[in-house]
Amino acid sequence: INMKNDAKVITPQEYWDNLSDIQYYMDEPVADPAAIALYFLSQEAAKKVKVVLSGEGSDELFGGYNIYCEPLEHTSFNKIPMPIRRMLGNFAERCLPRGMKGRGFLMRHGKTLEERYFANATNIFTEREANRILKKGCKPGIQKVTAPLYERVKDKDSVTKMQYVDMHLWLVHDILMKGDKMGMANSLEVRVPFLDKKVLELAQTQVGGQAV
C-alpha cells in the first residue's frame, strides 16, 4: 500500500539509560516489558504528531487473545470430572519438570476457570510456590479481587467471563495505564477508538465465543 514505516532498534545501552525514567513515569511497579518498547515508540511518534490512534480494547472486546480459544478447544477434556482433573493437576505441579509439554495444561485444567484465570497474563510462580516465598500476611489472594467480577457474569459462558475479567483488570490496570503514561511521558496523546461506547455496545451483541 506504499506505506512508509519508520524503524528503530533499541540498543542495550539505550534500554539501561532510559529504564529508570520509564519506571518513574509508570508511578508504580508494572511487570510488563511492553512498556519499554511503548515508551520508545511514543518518543518516535511524538517527533511527527501529537495525537495517535491505538488499538487498545479490541482484543478484550472482540476475542483477539489466543487464550480465549482454550475453553472452546478443550471441551472434551473438561468433561472429565473435576476431582480427577484436580488430581492430575496436582500431580503435574509436584512431579513433572518445568517446561515439560502438557504440565501447564494439566495444572490449568485442574482448577475451575474462576480459580485459575485472573487476567491475560503469565504466572511466574504457582500458588504453592508463592505461598512458600511470601510472608503469612501476604499470601496470594487473587480470588478476592476476581470473585465479585465472576459473580456478575456467573450465568455467562467461559469466554465471556474471561473477556469480562480482562476488561476490568488487565485492560484498566495494565494496558490503558501503560499506553497513557508512556504517551504522556513524551507529550503524546494516545486515543483508543475501539473503546468508544457504540463499539462496546456492538461487542456486547456477540454470542459467547462468536468472535473467537
Language-model features: where?
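A short, charged helix-loop
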Residues: 140-151
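Short Ser/Thr-interspersed hydrophobic loop/turn segments at strand-loop and sheet-helix junctions
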Residues: 167-181, 203
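ATP-dependent adenylate-handling active sites, centered on carboxylate activation for C-N bond formation
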Residues: 1-141, 158, 181-212
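Structural motif
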Residues: 31, 153-166
